[in-house]
């Protein structure tokens, strides 16, 4: 919608540009205020936030992957003026056509994650960590575990 311009942040330069082009083509009433790839350092956050603010965007789609996108949003939301920020994971890869979505049957039964894991086997490491994470959340909640863990290294 023209009243809610969007900004895309994340992916490779080629992927985010192609995602922007496809969104503009498929949704002619959507105003793309701008886009920027996701390969930048923390030192560039202020410059990126300024670019987003100056674009006039009201919605920011952040596709930096989990948990980087959530951490980036949390760290920078105060710099973004009146902007709604949403983490979208690898959506730009799908929108750009770089990655195919799971067949509809897989989507309907909730197995799109498995299809993506087969396309990108490196995701398997994350899946293995989830039960451990849940167990540690429970143990921590009841004071049975107190050590800090860096999950994503």
Predicted regions and their residues:
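Short, flexible loop segments at boundaries between secondary-structure elements
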Residues: 37-43, 81-119
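Conserved beta-alpha
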Residues: 1-51, 55
């Amino acid at each position: 919608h023209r009243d809610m311009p969007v900004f895309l942040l994340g992916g490779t330069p080629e992927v985010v540009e192609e995602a922007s082009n496809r969104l503009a083509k498929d949704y002619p009433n959507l105003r793309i205020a701008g886009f920027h790839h996701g390969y930048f350092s923390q030192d560039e956050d202020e410059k990126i936030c300024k670019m987003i603010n100056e674009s006039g965007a009201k919605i920011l789609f952040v596709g930096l992957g989990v948990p980087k996108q959530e951490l980036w949003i949390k760290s920078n939301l105060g710099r973004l003026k009146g902007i709604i920020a949403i983490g979208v994971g690898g959506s730009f890869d799908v929108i750009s056509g770089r990655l195919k979505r799971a067949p509809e049957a897989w989507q309907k039964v909730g197995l799109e994650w498995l299809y993506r894991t087969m396309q990108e086997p490196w995701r398997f490491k994350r899946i293995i960590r989830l039960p451990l994470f849940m167990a540690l959340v429970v143990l921590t909640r009841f004071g049975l575990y107190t050590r800090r863990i860096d999950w994503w290294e």
